[in-house]
């Protein structure tokens, strides 16, 4: 047997194997189509209600937008309070001793901590609602998003503790 005959034999074997695989794929496709039509025939007609479902990317975008909006609100509140403090200092400079009073400072810190904890509670409740309403296939994406969110919260809490 020479090299040319061996090549022809190998090519014919490979082509027969490929032909068999193609035939098997066609049979599988036919079976799949038959199964789908059987399932459609068995099921009663359904009315489709279209609802816009959020994808994991949409959810991430909404969360990041909510975080951004909250940070903007905090910045606006800081700016407003800074402006009010400037006006307050201009109007009544003799009250500066009261501001430095430890009891007043404690009240302000307590108020700020209460606000922070309230916002933290709301964020965690939203997080739990999101985790409870998730489908099994999106679970990994949601868990990654949750881990990132919890890391963000932990960093905020650590910053508060340092102050």
Swiss-Prot record:
Which cellular component appears as one GO term in the record? extracellular region
- Phenotype upon loss of function: Deletion mutant is motile and binds to host cells. It shows a reduction in host cell invasion, induces significantly less IL-8 than the wild-type and has reduced MAP kinase signaling. Mutant is also deficient in maximal phosphorylation of cortactin at the ERK-1/2 phosphorylation sites and in stimulating membrane ruffling. Mutant exhibits reduced virulence in a mouse model of campylobacteriosis.
Localization terms from the record? Secreted; Host cytoplasm, Host cytosol
| Keyword tags | Host cytoplasm, Secreted, Virulence
What Pfam families would the database entry show?
CiaD
List the ranges annotated as motif MKD.
135-145
What this protein is reported to do is described as: Effector protein required for the development of acute disease and colon inflammatory lesions. Required for maximal host cell invasion and maximal secretion of the inflammatory chemokine interleukin-8 (IL-8) from host cells. Acts by activating the host MAP kinase signaling pathways ERK-1/2 and p38 to promote both cellular invasion and the release of IL-8. CiaD mediated activation of ERK-1/2 leads to the phosphorylation of host cortactin (CTTN) on serine residues and association of cortactin with N-WASP, promoting actin cytoskeleton rearrangement, membrane ruffling and host cell invasion.
Instruction: Please state what the annotation says regarding this protein's domains.
Output: The Mitogen-activated protein (MAP) kinase-docking motif (MKD) is necessary for cellular invasion and IL-8 secretion. Interaction with IQGAP1 is independent of the MKD motif.
Q: How does it assemble?
A: Interacts with the host cell protein IQGAP1, thus displacing RACGAP1 from the IQGAP1 complex.
* Protein name, UniProt field: Campylobacter invasion antigen D
Gene name of the record = ciaD
